[in-house]
Amino acid sequence: MTTEDLLYVRKELLTGFQVMKKDHRTQVKGRKSSTVNNYMMLMAEIFQFGTDNGYAKENPFSGINRLKKAKGEPDPLTTDEFIRFIQACGHQQMRNLWSLAVYTGMRHGELCGLAWEDIDLHAGTIIVKRNLTQTDEFTLPKTDAGTDRVIYLIQPAIDALRNQAQLTRLGRQFEVEVKLREYGQSVIQPCTFVFSPQCVKRGPRTGYHYAVNSINKIWAPIIKRAGIRYRNAYQSRHTYACWSLSAGANPNFIATQMGHTDAQMVYKVYGKWMSEKSAEQVSLLNQALSRYAPSLPQSMVAAQ
Protein backbone atom coordinates (compact mmCIF):
# COMPACT_ATOMS: atom_id res chain seq x y z
CA MET A 1 0.00 0.00 0.00
CA THR A 2 1.31 3.43 -0.96
CA THR A 3 0.80 6.91 0.41
CA GLU A 4 -1.32 7.65 -2.67
CA ASP A 5 -3.62 4.74 -1.79
CA LEU A 6 -4.04 6.05 1.74
CA LEU A 7 -4.85 9.55 0.53
CA TYR A 8 -7.61 8.04 -1.61
CA VAL A 9 -8.94 6.13 1.41
CA ARG A 10 -8.93 9.34 3.43
CA LYS A 11 -10.85 11.19 0.70
CA GLU A 12 -13.48 8.43 0.62
CA LEU A 13 -13.83 8.53 4.39
CA LEU A 14 -14.25 12.29 4.28
CA THR A 15 -16.71 12.54 1.39
CA GLY A 16 -18.19 9.05 0.88
CA PHE A 17 -21.43 7.55 2.19
CA GLN A 18 -21.51 6.08 5.68
CA VAL A 19 -22.51 2.48 6.40
CA MET A 20 -25.80 2.84 8.26
CA LYS A 21 -27.72 0.53 10.57
CA LYS A 22 -30.50 -1.62 9.08
CA ASP A 23 -33.31 0.51 10.51
CA HIS A 24 -31.73 3.76 9.29
CA ARG A 25 -33.36 4.58 5.95
CA THR A 26 -31.65 7.87 5.12
CA GLN A 27 -28.11 7.66 3.78
CA VAL A 28 -25.58 10.03 5.30
CA LYS A 29 -22.70 11.36 3.24
CA GLY A 30 -19.41 12.59 4.61
CA ARG A 31 -17.71 12.55 8.01
CA LYS A 32 -16.15 15.13 10.27
CA SER A 33 -12.43 15.80 9.97
CA SER A 34 -11.95 14.69 13.58
CA THR A 35 -13.64 11.34 12.83
CA VAL A 36 -11.50 10.75 9.75
CA ASN A 37 -8.36 11.68 11.71
CA ASN A 38 -9.25 9.09 14.34
CA TYR A 39 -9.77 6.37 11.73
CA MET A 40 -6.50 7.23 10.01
CA MET A 41 -4.63 7.30 13.31
CA LEU A 42 -5.79 3.77 14.14
CA MET A 43 -4.65 2.52 10.73
CA ALA A 44 -1.33 4.35 11.12
CA GLU A 45 -0.69 2.56 14.42
CA ILE A 46 -1.30 -0.81 12.76
CA PHE A 47 1.15 0.01 9.96
CA GLN A 48 3.68 1.31 12.48
CA PHE A 49 3.45 -1.99 14.37
CA GLY A 50 4.12 -3.81 11.10
CA THR A 51 7.12 -1.60 10.35
CA ASP A 52 8.58 -1.93 13.84
CA ASN A 53 8.32 -5.71 13.73
CA GLY A 54 9.70 -6.26 10.24
CA TYR A 55 6.46 -6.97 8.39
CA ALA A 56 6.92 -3.89 6.20
CA LYS A 57 9.95 -1.85 5.18
CA GLU A 58 8.35 1.53 5.78
CA ASN A 59 5.15 3.08 7.08
CA PRO A 60 3.18 4.68 4.20
CA PHE A 61 1.50 6.97 6.75
CA SER A 62 4.77 8.80 7.43
CA GLY A 63 4.01 11.43 4.78
CA ILE A 64 0.36 12.02 5.71
CA ASN A 65 -0.62 14.91 7.96
CA ARG A 66 -3.81 15.18 9.99
CA LEU A 67 -6.74 17.02 8.43
CA LYS A 68 -7.23 20.50 9.80
CA LYS A 69 -10.35 21.03 11.87
CA ALA A 70 -12.42 24.19 11.90
CA LYS A 71 -12.45 25.72 15.36
CA GLY A 72 -16.01 26.10 16.55
CA GLU A 73 -16.76 29.29 18.42
CA PRO A 74 -18.47 29.01 21.80
CA ASP A 75 -22.21 29.51 21.39
CA PRO A 76 -23.51 29.96 24.95
CA LEU A 77 -27.12 30.22 25.96
CA THR A 78 -28.32 33.68 26.85
CA THR A 79 -29.87 34.12 30.28
CA ASP A 80 -33.33 34.34 28.70
CA GLU A 81 -32.73 31.16 26.68
CA PHE A 82 -31.52 29.34 29.77
CA ILE A 83 -34.66 30.27 31.71
CA ARG A 84 -36.82 29.00 28.84
CA PHE A 85 -34.69 25.85 28.60
CA ILE A 86 -35.11 25.03 32.30
CA GLN A 87 -38.85 25.70 32.11
CA ALA A 88 -39.08 23.25 29.19
CA CYS A 89 -37.52 20.40 31.18
CA GLY A 90 -40.19 17.78 31.79
CA HIS A 91 -38.83 16.42 35.07
CA GLN A 92 -37.30 17.98 38.18
CA GLN A 93 -34.18 15.84 37.76
CA MET A 94 -33.59 17.32 34.31
CA ARG A 95 -33.91 20.84 35.70
CA ASN A 96 -31.39 19.98 38.39
CA LEU A 97 -28.98 18.28 35.98
CA TRP A 98 -28.83 21.09 33.46
CA SER A 99 -28.73 23.76 36.15
CA LEU A 100 -25.69 22.06 37.66
CA ALA A 101 -24.11 21.67 34.21
CA VAL A 102 -24.46 25.37 33.41
CA TYR A 103 -23.51 26.64 36.88
CA THR A 104 -20.37 24.47 37.20
CA GLY A 105 -19.14 23.86 33.64
CA MET A 106 -18.64 20.16 34.40
CA ARG A 107 -18.04 17.80 31.51
CA HIS A 108 -20.98 15.54 30.74
CA GLY A 109 -18.98 12.43 31.59
CA GLU A 110 -18.21 13.96 34.98
CA LEU A 111 -21.90 14.64 35.55
CA CYS A 112 -22.76 11.03 34.68
CA GLY A 113 -20.22 9.78 37.20
CA LEU A 114 -21.02 12.30 39.93
CA ALA A 115 -21.82 10.68 43.29
CA TRP A 116 -23.13 12.07 46.56
CA GLU A 117 -19.90 10.86 48.16
CA ASP A 118 -18.11 13.60 46.13
CA ILE A 119 -20.28 16.47 47.40
CA ASP A 120 -20.14 18.60 50.55
CA LEU A 121 -23.17 20.88 50.53
CA HIS A 122 -22.16 22.52 53.82
CA ALA A 123 -18.81 23.56 52.34
CA GLY A 124 -20.38 24.18 48.93
CA THR A 125 -17.90 21.98 47.04
CA ILE A 126 -17.66 19.07 44.62
CA ILE A 127 -14.52 16.94 44.28
CA VAL A 128 -14.37 15.56 40.73
CA LYS A 129 -13.08 11.99 41.05
CA ARG A 130 -14.21 10.19 37.92
CA ASN A 131 -15.44 10.50 34.35
CA LEU A 132 -17.69 8.23 32.29
CA THR A 133 -16.41 7.61 28.76
CA GLN A 134 -18.37 7.13 25.54
CA THR A 135 -17.77 3.38 25.95
CA ASP A 136 -19.36 3.40 29.44
CA GLU A 137 -16.10 2.94 31.34
CA PHE A 138 -15.34 4.91 34.47
CA THR A 139 -11.93 6.55 34.29
CA LEU A 140 -10.16 9.43 35.94
CA PRO A 141 -11.20 12.87 34.62
CA LYS A 142 -9.83 13.92 31.24
CA THR A 143 -6.78 15.84 32.49
CA ASP A 144 -4.44 15.59 35.48
CA ALA A 145 -5.52 19.10 36.44
CA GLY A 146 -9.14 17.98 36.36
CA THR A 147 -8.60 14.97 38.62
CA ASP A 148 -9.64 15.46 42.26
CA ARG A 149 -10.20 19.12 41.50
CA VAL A 150 -12.41 21.06 43.87
CA ILE A 151 -15.33 22.91 42.29
CA TYR A 152 -16.59 25.78 44.42
CA LEU A 153 -20.34 25.99 43.97
CA ILE A 154 -22.35 29.16 43.52
CA GLN A 155 -25.77 29.32 45.16
CA PRO A 156 -27.89 28.21 42.15
CA ALA A 157 -25.76 25.06 41.86
CA ILE A 158 -26.18 24.35 45.58
CA ASP A 159 -29.94 24.85 45.24
CA ALA A 160 -30.07 22.39 42.32
CA LEU A 161 -28.19 19.77 44.35
CA ARG A 162 -30.44 20.25 47.37
CA ASN A 163 -33.46 19.68 45.14
CA GLN A 164 -31.81 16.60 43.65
CA ALA A 165 -30.97 15.23 47.10
CA GLN A 166 -34.67 14.69 47.69
CA LEU A 167 -34.71 12.36 44.68
CA THR A 168 -31.50 10.31 44.91
CA ARG A 169 -29.52 11.01 48.10
CA LEU A 170 -30.84 7.86 49.80
CA GLY A 171 -30.45 5.72 46.69
CA ARG A 172 -28.49 2.54 46.26
CA GLN A 173 -24.71 2.70 46.67
CA PHE A 174 -22.57 0.92 44.06
CA GLU A 175 -18.96 -0.24 44.09
CA VAL A 176 -17.57 1.24 40.86
CA GLU A 177 -14.31 0.28 39.19
CA VAL A 178 -12.45 3.39 38.02
CA LYS A 179 -9.57 2.82 35.60
CA LEU A 180 -6.38 4.74 36.33
CA ARG A 181 -4.03 6.23 33.74
CA GLU A 182 -1.50 3.42 34.15
CA TYR A 183 -2.44 0.40 32.04
CA GLY A 184 -4.16 -2.34 34.02
CA GLN A 185 -4.53 -0.28 37.18
CA SER A 186 -7.88 0.60 38.74
CA VAL A 187 -9.51 1.51 42.05
CA ILE A 188 -12.92 0.76 43.54
CA GLN A 189 -14.98 3.77 44.60
CA PRO A 190 -18.35 3.79 46.42
CA CYS A 191 -20.90 5.74 44.39
CA THR A 192 -24.45 6.81 45.13
CA PHE A 193 -25.15 8.43 41.79
CA VAL A 194 -26.58 11.94 41.88
CA PHE A 195 -28.47 11.61 38.60
CA SER A 196 -30.31 8.33 38.06
CA PRO A 197 -32.54 7.34 35.11
CA GLN A 198 -34.58 5.35 37.64
CA CYS A 199 -36.10 8.65 38.83
CA VAL A 200 -37.64 9.23 35.42
CA LYS A 201 -38.38 5.71 34.22
CA ARG A 202 -38.20 2.60 36.37
CA GLY A 203 -37.68 -0.79 34.81
CA PRO A 204 -35.34 -3.79 34.63
CA ARG A 205 -33.51 -2.32 31.64
CA THR A 206 -33.10 1.13 33.15
CA GLY A 207 -29.64 1.82 34.56
CA TYR A 208 -28.68 3.62 37.74
CA HIS A 209 -26.55 6.25 36.05
CA TYR A 210 -26.78 8.05 32.72
CA ALA A 211 -24.58 7.33 29.71
CA VAL A 212 -22.84 10.26 28.04
CA ASN A 213 -24.75 9.71 24.80
CA SER A 214 -28.09 9.70 26.62
CA ILE A 215 -27.24 13.06 28.23
CA ASN A 216 -26.66 14.50 24.77
CA LYS A 217 -29.93 13.02 23.49
CA ILE A 218 -31.88 14.55 26.39
CA TRP A 219 -30.67 18.03 25.44
CA ALA A 220 -32.12 18.24 21.91
CA PRO A 221 -35.84 17.71 22.73
CA ILE A 222 -35.64 20.27 25.53
CA ILE A 223 -34.10 22.82 23.17
CA LYS A 224 -36.95 22.15 20.74
CA ARG A 225 -39.68 22.47 23.38
CA ALA A 226 -38.13 25.70 24.62
CA GLY A 227 -38.32 27.14 21.11
CA ILE A 228 -34.72 28.34 21.10
CA ARG A 229 -32.04 28.04 18.46
CA TYR A 230 -30.31 24.67 18.44
CA ARG A 231 -26.71 24.25 19.52
CA ASN A 232 -25.01 21.10 20.80
CA ALA A 233 -25.14 19.98 24.42
CA TYR A 234 -21.48 20.84 25.05
CA GLN A 235 -22.54 24.48 25.05
CA SER A 236 -23.63 23.99 28.66
CA ARG A 237 -19.91 24.02 29.53
CA HIS A 238 -19.23 27.01 27.28
CA THR A 239 -22.18 28.83 28.86
CA TYR A 240 -20.60 28.55 32.32
CA ALA A 241 -17.27 29.90 31.09
CA CYS A 242 -18.75 32.76 29.05
CA TRP A 243 -21.15 33.88 31.78
CA SER A 244 -18.43 33.75 34.43
CA LEU A 245 -15.89 35.70 32.38
CA SER A 246 -18.47 38.28 31.33
CA ALA A 247 -19.22 38.76 35.04
CA GLY A 248 -15.54 39.54 35.64
CA ALA A 249 -14.35 36.24 37.14
CA ASN A 250 -10.60 35.56 37.25
CA PRO A 251 -9.59 33.39 34.23
CA ASN A 252 -7.22 31.35 36.41
CA PHE A 253 -10.08 30.54 38.78
CA ILE A 254 -12.32 29.53 35.86
CA ALA A 255 -9.55 27.33 34.43
CA THR A 256 -9.22 25.54 37.78
CA GLN A 257 -12.99 25.11 38.09
CA MET A 258 -13.21 23.58 34.61
CA GLY A 259 -10.18 21.31 34.96
CA HIS A 260 -7.78 23.06 32.58
CA THR A 261 -4.06 22.94 33.33
CA ASP A 262 -3.79 26.72 33.21
CA ALA A 263 -5.62 29.79 31.96
CA GLN A 264 -4.13 29.58 28.45
CA MET A 265 -7.07 27.55 27.15
CA VAL A 266 -9.52 30.01 28.72
CA TYR A 267 -7.82 32.97 27.03
CA LYS A 268 -7.64 31.13 23.71
CA VAL A 269 -11.26 29.95 23.56
CA TYR A 270 -13.12 32.65 25.48
CA GLY A 271 -10.98 35.74 24.90
CA LYS A 272 -13.72 37.87 23.38
CA TRP A 273 -15.93 37.43 26.45
CA MET A 274 -13.17 38.97 28.54
CA SER A 275 -12.74 42.01 26.28
CA GLU A 276 -16.22 43.18 27.24
CA LYS A 277 -14.81 44.08 30.66
CA SER A 278 -11.98 46.29 29.32
CA ALA A 279 -13.59 49.57 30.43
CA GLU A 280 -14.19 48.22 33.92
CA GLN A 281 -10.59 47.02 34.14
CA VAL A 282 -9.28 50.47 33.15
CA SER A 283 -11.50 52.06 35.80
CA LEU A 284 -10.22 49.57 38.38
CA LEU A 285 -6.59 50.31 37.47
CA ASN A 286 -7.24 54.06 37.62
CA GLN A 287 -8.58 53.72 41.15
CA ALA A 288 -5.82 51.39 42.32
CA LEU A 289 -2.77 52.95 40.68
CA SER A 290 -3.52 56.67 40.46
CA ARG A 291 -2.37 57.21 44.02
CA TYR A 292 1.12 56.04 43.02
CA ALA A 293 1.45 58.64 40.23
CA PRO A 294 3.88 61.49 41.05
CA SER A 295 2.21 64.87 41.34
CA LEU A 296 3.04 67.32 38.55
CA PRO A 297 3.10 71.14 38.63
CA GLN A 298 -0.16 72.64 37.37
CA SER A 299 1.64 74.35 34.47
CA MET A 300 2.94 71.01 33.18
CA VAL A 301 -0.49 69.43 33.45
CA ALA A 302 -2.02 72.33 31.50
CA ALA A 303 0.68 72.07 28.85
CA GLN A 304 -0.07 68.40 28.34
Model-derived features with residue positions:
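Short, basic (Lys/Arg/His-rich) helix/loop patches that form interaction surfaces
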Residues: 19-23, 87, 91-94, 104, ...
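C-terminal secondary-structure termini that scaffold catalytic or DNA-interacting sites
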Residues: 123, 136-159, 163-171, 180-183, ...
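A short, basic/aromatic helix-end/turn motif that makes direct DNA contacts
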Residues: 113-119, 255-261, 271
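Short, charged phosphate-coordinating catalytic segments
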Residues: 48-59, 101-132, 252
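Short pre-functional
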Residues: 41-48, 95-112, 242-246
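Catalytic-site neighborhood detector that most strongly recognizes the C-terminal catalytic loop/helix
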Residues: 68, 76, 132, 239, ...
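DNA breakage-rejoining catalytic core of tyrosine-based enzymes
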Residues: 55-58, 68-87, 123, 129, ...
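N-terminal core-binding DNA-recognition domain of tyrosine recombinases/integrases
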Residues: 1-73, 84-88, 227
